């Protein structure tokens, strides 16, 4: 496949911090790097809005339906712009070196079942929010989790 016909990733993604009323945060382990993270993923097309991307990625990666009446998806109105790791830059158009990431929180009931996408993730765990922040590979992911007390209903 030549560069002209190749479909590149869109450098706009979401980060979704999934948490319970007791402020346990879901982390999932990546297949390719073995690192722990929250749900992340890029827009499928340029006109997909941030919330659509968040709902789709959560369902694809965890099997959790963010639109379920017992779940509460919240756009935290935060964006991170960062350099794309060199190991992943091949996924993007040659002139692209930075990604913009929109941060969401998703409140789910205690005991929400998790069904991973085995091609993307190998394991999952619920951790206290501070421990989850310490366990993340990505600095922007850790920073988002540390903001949970600011955005979670009732604080943390």
Give the predicted meaning of each segment.
Residues 150-156:
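Generic C-terminal helix-cap and adjacent flexible tail
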Residues 77-113:
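Active-site-adjacent beta-strand/loop module that shapes the phosphate/pyrophosphate-binding cleft
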Residues 11, 38, 97-101:
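Short connector loops at helix/strand junctions that flank enzyme active sites
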Residues 1-17, 93-94:
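Acidic, metal-coordinating catalytic segment for phosphate/diphosphate chemistry
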Residues 102-108, 113-146:
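NUDIX/MutT-family hydrolases
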Residues 20-66:
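Conserved Nudix-box catalytic region and its N-terminal flanking loop in Nudix hydrolases
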């Amino acid at each position: 496949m030549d560069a002209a016909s190749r479909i590149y990733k869109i450098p706009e993604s979401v980060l979704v911090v999934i948490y319970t009323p007791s402020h346990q945060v879901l982390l999932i382990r990546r297949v390719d790097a073995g690192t722990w993270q929250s749900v992340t993923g890029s827009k499928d097309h340029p006109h997909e809005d941030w919330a659509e991307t968040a709902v789709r990625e959560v369902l694809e990666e965890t099997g959790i339906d963010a639109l379920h009446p017992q779940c509460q998806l919240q756009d935290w109105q935060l964006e991170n712009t960062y350099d794309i790791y060199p190991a992943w830059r091949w996924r993007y158009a040659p002139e692209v070196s930075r990604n913009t990431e929109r941060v969401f929180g998703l409140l789910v009931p205690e005991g929400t079942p998790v069904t991973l996408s085995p091609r993307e993730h190998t394991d999952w765990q619920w951790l206290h929010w501070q421990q989850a922040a310490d366990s993340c590979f990505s600095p922007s992911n850790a920073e988002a989790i540390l903001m949970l007390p600011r955005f979670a209903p009732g604080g943390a």
